[in-house]
Amino acid sequence: SHFSMYLEGWPDDTLIDAPLGNVIMRESLNRITEQKYSLDSGEISISVDDEKGLLHLSLPFPSDIETGIYRLEAKTCLGEKTYHSDLLWIVCPEKCYQPPPFQTGSRIAGISIALYGVRSERNWGVGDFFDLKNIVDWARDELKVDFVGINPLHALFNKRPFNNSPYLPSSRFYRNFIYLDIIGMEDFKESPKAQALVALPETQNRIQRLQNEEHVNYEEIADLKTSLLQELFRTFLENHGKSHRHHHRWTEFETYRVSEGIYIERYATFCALQDHFQGELPEAHTWRQWPVAFHSPSGPAVKKFQIENEERILFWIYVQWQIDIQLQSVQERAIQKGMLIGLYHDEALAVDRNGADFWGWQDYFHDGFSVGAPPDAFAPEGQDWGFPPPDRERIRRSGYEPFLKILQVNCRHGGALRIDHVMQLNHLFWIPMGKKASEGVFVKDYESDLLSLVCLESERGRTLIVGEDLGTVPFNYRERLMSKGILSYRLFYFERDQHENQLPFRDYPQSALVSISTHDLPTLAGFWSYRDIDLRREMGQVDTQQEKALQEERRLHKAKIIERLVTDGFLPAQTAHAAWESPVPTDDLHTAVLSFIFHTPSKLALINQEDLFLDIRQQNFPGTTSEHPNWVTKMRFSLEDLRSNPEATRLAEKFRRLAEDSGRGLP
């Protein structure tokens, strides 16, 4: 019921006989409130440490304080000298936010798409926020879903030699500008020059070529959009810049910049430096190859660069501001359409050690280690994932500021958030640089603190939290997460008992999201056709003998799936054998699997668009980089096809009917 504060430098011969006046409590991190609490001397326990020159105050907690992040400041005067101290005080709820309908037993359905893979007649070869708004419309109108899951939108390099994995970004604080809808930006409408550039035959031909490419061409799309964004930024400055300080758009821009503070400053500085050195030192692909003077974000060389290149830095702040505006508009559309959740975001575990977050916040990482996984049956040598672990002590001493910032950013403009590898809140597997993965160790984190902070940001953002808890999970950890209101993440492929039998649909937990597969696993069509096993052989991951063993294991797994679907009443017994023998999912099998997922007691049922539309291609093939087209696969059906193609509309109608028959949806 009390907290303690120490005021340094207190004279050891001073008598304490006067009451302390006020304790000021300021809520930090984008909150602008200040509260003062007057305390009587009888409420304060005071003692003096003569040896250390400290005044120890024990003060009562205010009884009516709301959840939030506060900095408490205590100040007292002795003669002409003032003594003060402060401490961070974080007040957290017991559980994460739960939408009210969940408290009365509602269960809902959602569809998941990879935004980069959306095809449309309007986009520039990659899905954008205009497409996402149309996906939301289609999903609500045709599927009657309450949420749309999307891949992590984190900022990537969008260029070689870096990969395009949204799970190994340059920054988790900011987002990838390739998703911006250029034509929909306000400054595009105000820029005849930008409109003329887009209308040029060579630009239109380039856009059409990018649309028609089999895979997403991140680098060329980023180059094209960057050139247009620079023109739009010039238009913004001319029409609304510093000479128009009182214009509402400049005020909104400044409000965004100030609210993001040092985080956006360092991110934008990194991007500007990257552009600068790409011209000066084309072979310098990472910040570690820049001149040493630019390795520190707070060093004099960087400060000088910031002064001399203010507009280049403002440009990258402008880009993120525009992303924020467009993403907010998508979430608002989802809620207006009647969705309970709207966008379901995804927060990656990792950051690239060559990226903006690491450069800007080096003190918060351990560069001498990599995160990975210990040896197991899947990877006998263990796994080294290549990214650095966080410095848990420095992050804790900061008041968990970067941890909170990442949560806040990724909860923003959405109704649910998936935390990748949620075991990170408990531990990570650290591997010393240069050592084998088998030589790594598990390092514990401050789990209780981190879980409480997740609850806090979930409540403040009114965001449902899903914890990706696949893999090696500590004993009782799933139960602990559920007790905090964090939904578990359950996959149809993996939910099996000790005898390898598929679990009955009734045995799935209520506090969970259930799905068929993920971006790292074969789609239903790929699983049934052994496509993932074929790929492993083609890429030399397994030999012929191992391939045959995996195929036999898969045949047995498919038989167990058929048995469960028949037993639970989702697959007619007379079509079971044909479904098992078929090299592709039969219509009956597809219907049965979808119906099984929808009928589980789990609060959220999520179907990936690849599994709805029976696409054989998976988004990512673990253990590969250039050997497999990862994170570049475009959707089988275009945005226009979704409402007009007979096969697409038939499958959408099946989704809606099965979800409604299972009782999913709001009353």
Predicted regions and their residues:
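Acidic/aromatic-lined carbohydrate-recognition and catalytic surfaces
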Residues: 2-13, 17-74, 90-360
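Hydrophobic faces of well-ordered beta-strands that scaffold small-molecule active sites
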Residues: 109-113, 146-150, 341-345, 417, ...
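The substrate-binding groove and active-site-proximal loops of carbohydrate-active enzymes
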Residues: 114-129, 215, 307-322, 383-401, ...
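Short, solvent-exposed turn/loop segments enriched in Gly/Ser/Thr/Pro and often Arg
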Residues: 149-160, 347-352, 420-425, 468-471, ...
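Acidic, His- and aromatic-enriched active-site or binding-groove loops in soluble protein domains
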Residues: 164-192, 357-381, 441-451, 486-498
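Conserved alpha/beta catalytic core and glycan-binding cleft of carbohydrate-active enzymes
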Residues: 249-252, 360, 462, 469-612, ...
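Active-site neighborhood of glycoside hydrolase catalytic domains
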Residues: 319-337, 399-486
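Substrate-binding/active-site clefts of carbohydrate-active enzymes
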Residues: 340-402, 406-409, 428-443
